[in-house]
Amino acid sequence: MKGLGFAGVYTLALYAANFIQIPQRSMQSIATGIISQAWKDKNYAEINRIYQRSSINMLLMSLFIFGCLLLNIENLFSVLKVQENYTAAINLMIVLGLVRVIDAGTGVNGTIIATSTFWKFDFFSGIILLAIRLPLAYIMIRQFDIIGAAYAELISISLYNFIRFEFLRRKFNM
């Protein structure tokens, strides 16, 4: 399979993996106002508490959803009568699911940085992500076909979240 066939398989895997992010998006929306108020009140203990709890809770929720997806993926494919060549999406779903679990496991680190006085770091770390992701995806796709795109996503998002984690640890001792 080449070209648009790969795009269809990747899209199917991406939609399934994005299902893991639903609790994360809700948690970030709720936490934004609370974290903004805590920054205003200089309540660093509250920000740290939210960061720790969100990381643990989102990691557990995303692992649960990821596990449910993995356990039921073949049943889902048979119920939806997915074409045989789309079963290649299973490996993609595993890798992209890990990306979403890692992203969720870092909690609301992006929200904390974006609402702090260091909001510019969030912008620059996004540029770093882009600068890493594009060439890495190009190289990995040439080397490993479509699964290379998922590996590139895994590497770049892991590095991106590690950079933000380290920033919070060094600047705010969180």
Question: Where are each of the predicted segments found?
Answer:
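Interfacial segments at transmembrane-helix termini and the short loops linking adjacent helices
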Residues: 5, 60, 69-101, 147
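Membrane-interface "helix-start" segments
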Residues: 54-58, 92-95, 124, 156-174
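Membrane-water interface segments that mark the loop-to-transmembrane alpha-helix transition
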Residues: 45-66, 125
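Transmembrane helix-bundle signature of multi-pass secondary active exporters and lipid flippases
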Residues: 10-29, 61-65, 96-103, 156, ...
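Membrane-interface helix-loop junctions in multi-pass transport and translocation proteins
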Residues: 5, 120, 127-162, 166
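Helix-loop junctions and terminal segments of transmembrane helices
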Residues: 13-55, 109-115
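Interfacial/gating helices of multi-pass transporter permease domains
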Residues: 1-18, 42, 46-50, 86-91, ...
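Membrane-interface junctions at transmembrane-helix termini in multi-pass inner-membrane proteins
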Residues: 97-128, 139, 168-172
